[in-house]
Regions:
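Polytopic transmembrane helical bundles with strong interfacial aromatic enrichment
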Residues: 1-154
Length: 154
């Protein structure tokens, strides 16, 4: 049964990584919509209104990321993964909470850490997914062979 949960864990990890790609797409769409506005009041106002669509998708998708991270953490128990891996999943959940708080601080310099924390979330999720991949063949680690003593010159 744990084998099925390991596969589910791998699938959820890939879904999380796909969600992160969407997050980056949505936020970039919002930023570049604003950045490409002409330097007049009407154009800037229109750009902000158009960027709202991307920002709203970024916020909604952020909630989906949170749900998947909670599922990822719960599945790590069901898959009977090592304690270290479960601990790293707990860290991932903690980083998500920090991510949510950073997005709502109201202090621009502090909220800027939101982007850096996102990179840490992406890296940790990629590590956990790759390290615990349940599909395909795993290559056994190289075994140490006892070397023969080198012949001595005569």
């Amino acid at each position: 049964m744990a084998n099925i949960f390991r596969k589910v864990y791998s699938v959820v990890g890939v879904l999380l990584l796909a969600e992160y790609v969407l997050q980056l797409f949505f936020i970039a769409g919002g930023i570049f919509t604003i950045a490409n506005a002409d330097d007049n009041q009407k154009s800037v106002y229109s750009a902000f209104k158009n960027a709202d669509n991307f920002m709203g998708l970024h916020a909604f998708n952020g909630w989906l990321v949170g749900i998947l991270i909670i599922a990822f953490f719960a599945i790590s128990f069901a898959a009977r993964l090592p304690r270290r891996t479960i601990g790293l999943n707990g860290l991932l959940l903690g980083l998500y909470v920090v991510q949510f708080v950073l997005a709502h601080t109201g202090i621009a310099a502090l909220s800027a850490v939101h982007g850096i924390n996102a990179l840490v979330l992406i890296g940790l999720t990629g590590y956990l997914t790759g390290r615990n991949w349940a599909f395909g063949r795993r290559v056994a680690p190289a075994t140490a062979y006892k070397s023969e003593p080198s012949p001595t010159p005569r």
